[in-house]
Amino acid sequence: MLDLVNAQSPYGFADPALVATYPQQAAKAVPGYHDVHTMASVLLAELAPEDARVLVLGAGGGLETKALATAHPDWTFLAVDPSAAMLDLAMTTLGPLASRTSVHEGFVGDAPDGPFDAATALLLLHLLDREERLRTLADVHRRLRPGAPLVVMHVSYPQGDPAERELWLGRHEAYLVASGVEPAHVEKAGTMLRQHMPTLNPDEDRAVLEEAGFTGVTQFFSAFTFRGWIGYA
């Protein structure tokens, strides 16, 4: 979310130096970052069986997988990410919990079919335009058992009125400063959000989830420019 956007590869996820600091940067950039992992664990457990197979999209870094694996000792995971460096970081982060996690370097459309009992996509979908989001979510839906939960969380805030959009971006930048992020990095993050990130407004995000086949879509999280939803296959 910060310097991760400044390397040659998309969003910097192949730059070893930036990958190494991703967990710390994400925790500073996203209000309630670790709490979202706890909420995802609670929400998925409402319907997932004790021995659930969980599909984790954008799994690089490994912190959400670690939180889920710690809370649910009989769950197993497929971690999907196009960045080999991020998957390596995830397995390092997991430590002994890695024995319950397999990895797929690539995209969900060419990942194993499952079926899976639950899925997450945290801090992922805001990197994709609407068409790519819909295709990705449809690929997830096809891999889930009927009724299985999906938890998503990403950048999503009002886009229609330029003044309102700028208000939310300013709040996000102020939060980064208050979290101790260096001013130069805050400026780069602002440029990325304004010029490069294909952000949707919350109503559009919900509509894409429903168009992909998910039902009962409910927002469970809102913090400045971030929103989270749960839906069911």
Which residue stretches match the model-derived regions?
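Core SAM-dependent methyltransferase catalytic element
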Residues: 212-233
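Conserved class I S-adenosyl-L-methionine
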Residues: 149-178
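A short acidic, Gly/Pro-enriched loop at the edge of an enzyme's catalytic core
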Residues: 111-119
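Short alpha-helix
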Residues: 195-212
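Conserved alpha-helix/loop element of class I SAM-dependent methyltransferases that forms part
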Residues: 32-50
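N-terminal, positively charged/glycine-rich alpha-helical extensions of SAM-dependent methyltransferases
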Residues: 1-21
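A short glycine-rich, Lys/Arg-flanked "PGG" loop and its adjoining helix->strand segment in the class I
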Residues: 134-146
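Class I SAM-dependent methyltransferase SAM/SAH-binding core
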Residues: 53-57, 61-110
